[in-house]
Design a protein with these regions (language model features):
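Conserved GNAT acetyl-CoA-binding A-motif
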Residues: 120-129
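Conserved catalytic-core motifs of GNAT/GCN5-like acyltransferases
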Residues: 129-130, 145-163
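Long, contiguous binding/interaction regions
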Residues: 83-85, 140, 161
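Conserved acetyl-CoA-binding loop-helix of GNAT-fold acetyltransferases
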Residues: 103-116, 139-143
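Acetyl-CoA-dependent GNAT
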Residues: 42-92, 98-100, 168
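Hydrophobic adenine-recognition pocket in adenosine-nucleotide-binding enzymes
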Residues: 28, 97, 130
Length: 169
């Protein structure tokens, strides 16, 4: 059983999913351009999104390992998840679930799969920046064994964030 967290105004509700939550992580394909256009990249043309998908599928960004996955449940793309190597043996995992699919344990199931991929690729640490006001993400990461390290700071995007880390050893 997965324990998941659903954000509600005024706090986080813990929900237990009695049924197994099955998600697939797969690389984005050109056919996913419409979903990405509707959900995230309204300002881009289909051709621009297809070009971006091709770049993602090179599995590199700035000379480092990077992979963008579609999170798929019951045949529908319900979100996306990125893996990015930013230090030797340290990786960042960035999940995003589309609003209408939140609270259904898709983020937790996808994170569990992504942690497995990171281990398979030989990473020993996951390090995340999480906005201090993102209660759902903090609850998700804490439930997966991440711990806050250091003190809150303002990142390069101007957001107040904390670092959360998890050892893979």
């Amino acid at each position: 059983m997965l324990e998941c967290y659903q954000y509600k105004k005024g706090g986080i509700n813990s929900i237990n999913m009695k049924k197994k939550v099955i998600v697939q992580l797969r690389n984005f394909e050109k056919k996913d351009a419409l979903v990405l256009s509707e959900r995230i990249y309204q300002e881009l043309t289909t051709a621009q999104i297809e070009d971006m998908i091709c770049l993602w599928n090179t599995k590199q960004h700035d000379g480092k390992y990077f992979e963008m996955f579609a999170i798929v449940a019951s045949g529908k793309v319900v979100g996306r998840l990125s893996l990015y190597s930013y230090k030797d043996k340290t990786i960042s995992i960035g999940p995003e679930i589309f609003p209408e699919y939140r609270g259904k344990c898709f983020a937790k199931a996808a994170m569990i799969k992504a942690i497995g991929i990171a281990k398979e690729k030989g990473y020993s640490m996951i390090s995340q920046q999480i906005r201090v006001d993102n209660e759902a993400s903090i609850a998700l990461h804490t439930s997966l064994g991440f711990e806050m390290v250091g003190i809150p700071f303002v990142n390069s995007k101007g957001n107040n964030v904390c670092m959360y880390e998890k050892s893979l050893r």
